[in-house]
Each structure stands twice: as structure tokens, then as C-alpha cells.
Amino acid sequence: TKYSGLNATELAISESQERMAVVIEASAEEEFKRYCAEENIEVTHVADVTDSRRMRMYNKGKLVVDLSREFIDSAGAKHYAQAAIGAVEERDPFRREVKGGTLREKMLANLADDNVLSQKGLIEMFDSTIGASTVLLPFGGRTQRSETQVSVQKLPTDGYTDTASIMAFGYNPFLASWSPYHGAAYAVVDAAAKVVAAGARYDKMRYSYQEYFERMTKSPRTWGKPLGALLGALKMQVELGLPSIGGKDSMSGTFEQINVPPMLMAFGITTVDAGRVISTDFKKAGHSIYLVRHTPLENHMPDTGALKRNFDFVSSAIESGKIVSGYAVGFGGVAEALAKMSFGNGIGADAVSYTHLRAHETRGNL
């Protein structure tokens, strides 16, 4: 527990952070403790599995909790709530207006946005090379200034391997605030697009969802937000064939009158041949730059049929060596993508027109 001096009730119901419960054979206890000691992990024997069909907890030799297995299986009293998914504002949720009169002013304003600017100072506080498994550093290129959108790590194994895990996340708080349904759907798409842009196939991805919402009240509108988000994510799971195998939720995102935006953040992971992974930085002057466009449906939802075709096309082109750099267009639009792809090797880009540099953030574009 986080605090000392807790009474028996507090100990029984307290939440333990950064802990892991492991069930082992009694005969393996000493061997297991030895392994933990080798990894400098504190381990404590806290319970035994019995055939009494009761969960009993003791504190200082005194029985303080005694619950039947049948009661635990019932999950307690049933709760019911009404949910109402509210209508959304009639507008283009992807359109952004960037301040500035000239192209230079707009580019600088876009790159200075809190959701676009570099987080290198924060990232450098963490060691990305631990375990000698890192395939892509957080920033790539000769100058190490092109932002990487995925985490790629070779699998820990004895001997040599080219198999790596590749993971990315997706979430846009502005889109989710406009519509939790759309926000969750595009969170799934965003993570898949980043993985594809780095050289992996999307169709074997598995997800974990991190959900964080305001405190639930008696208002059906508050319950409608997590319901809408889960429906949006489920729709993408079904249409893209990408299941979520875990997750975590919290409904305590309220402080006085301040609520967190509706959040369903999608973390997607799959495997990839490390030799096929590509970075975001431009490699050579004279290379052509293409936008593989995703056009949302009239209701602003992802066109999953088009996305699957685009993802397959890009993956095949990367595997054949035709694509050497990739970036999933995000909050800052194509303008952000071109700038960040340029920084790594100091190689610029000539855009055909300002239209192609707009800072709209249509998700799923590569």
C-alpha cells in the first residue's frame, strides 16, 4: 500500500499501485523469490489458495474479512443506469483554423501549437535504450529530430531475433469532446495508421483501451459518454477485425466543476520484422512525396473499407522497398508531417500548393 498505519478495513479495500499478484505452486516459492531477487523486485507471500470456498483475511492474527465464494461470484448488488447519447454540433470536426497571413506564419503557428510542438525535452528524461532492444529511437535521422510515432522493440530472447513488437496509441481530446463515439473510433484508426506507416501490417493488431471519464451522476448524458465511446470503438473492432483484449477504466475524472474530456485511448500492438521497419525522416533529396488520402463518410466516421485498402497498399509498398519513410497524419495535418519528416536529416520538401499543406487533421491519412 502507499501509506503506513492503515487499519484492517483500509488495508482490505485499499488500491495497490504498481503491484502484481502471482499464483504459484507452493513448492516453487523459494525458487520464485530467488528470481525476483535477481531482478531487484520485492516479493511478499500474502495468501494461500484453499478449498474452503471462502476468502478469509487476517490482520494481526484476527479474522477481519470472511466472504463466501458464491457472494464474490455474484459481483455484489446489481446496478442500473439510463444512458442518453447526445447529438453532436453540426460542423466539420477535423477543420482547424491556423493563425497567420503568410505560409511561413501559418507553418510556425501550426508547429507552435501545444498539440504539435516537440516534446523532446520530456522524452529525453527517459532512457529509450534500456535492454538494447530498441529498433527506432524516439527521434530519428542524422540530427535525431524527426519524431517517431511508434515504439518498436525486439523481443527478449536468447540468441538473435529479427522479430519485434510495434506499438502505437491513438486519441484526440478535441474530437472526443465533440463526439465520444467518433473520438473512440478514430483512436483505433490512429493507432493502426501509425503502425502501418512504420512498416507493419495492421490486420494482426491487438488493442488495450484506457478509458477515463468524468464522475458518473444520475444524468443519462454522463452515462451516454462512455457508452458512445465504447460503441464507436466496438464498431471499429468489428469492421477492421481488430479486437481489444484488455484495458482499464476510471470514472473519477472530476474535480469540483472541472471534468476531463471523454477519453478512450487505444493502444495497439502487433509484431513486425525489424528489417522492414521504416522511420519518419526523409532519406534523400529528390524522392517523391505522396499523400494516401482517407476521406471520411458523410457522417464523419471512418471509411473502413477505404482504410483497409490504403493500409494494405502502403504495407505492400514498404515491403517491396518503394516507400522508405512514413508518417501518419495527425493533429497538425500534412504541414506538421512534412516539417517533422524534414527535421531529421535536414532535407526539405516542396509542396505542390498551399492546399496540400493545410493543417486539417483528417485521421487515417498517410
What is the predicted role of each segment?
Residues T1-R358, R363:
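Glycine/proline-enriched, intrinsically flexible loops and inter-domain linkers
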